[in-house]
Structures are given as C-alpha cells and as structure tokens.
Amino acid sequence: MSCCGGSCGCGSGCKCGSGCGGCGMYPDMEKSTTFTIIEGVAPINNYGNVEEKAAGEGCKCGSNCTCDPCNC
C-alpha cells in the first residue's frame, strides 16, 4: 500500500482519504484478518493474500496527496 507522506491513502472514488489505508476499494479488507486452518478435514484454502491483491490493483497516492494512477 502506498501513502502520501505517511498521512493519507486513496479512498473511494480515487480521492485521498485519511489514514494510511491504501485504495479503500475494499474497506473490510484493509485491516488484518486472522483465520484458523484445520488440516485434514478439508482442502487448505489460503485467503490471506486477498488484502494484497485488493491494494495492488487500486490507487496509489502520488505527490501532493493525489492518486496516481487512478485505477479504482
């Protein structure tokens, strides 16, 4: 996730939001999520990388707290 001077992240509509939260397209995915894997009962599915994917495909904060590029 990219930040503008450590103080803002890109929010909805590719406008800068408060806090260093990345794109903001998936607000429920911006916080860390813990999960438990029980092996041997079902196939192991690792959903922990969803947050990385959501942030990587969105906006990045550029200079002067503007979003660059705007891909939301």
UniProtKB/Swiss-Prot annotation:
InterPro entries: Metalthion_15p. Leaves and roots. Keywords: Metal-binding, Metal-thiolate cluster. It comes from the Eukaryota. Pfam families: Metallothio_2. One of its GO terms (molecular function) is metal ion binding. Belongs to the metallothionein superfamily. Type 15 family. Metallothioneins have a high content of cysteine residues that bind various heavy metals. This is Metallothionein-like protein type 2 A. It comes from Solanum lycopersicum (Tomato). The gene is MTA.
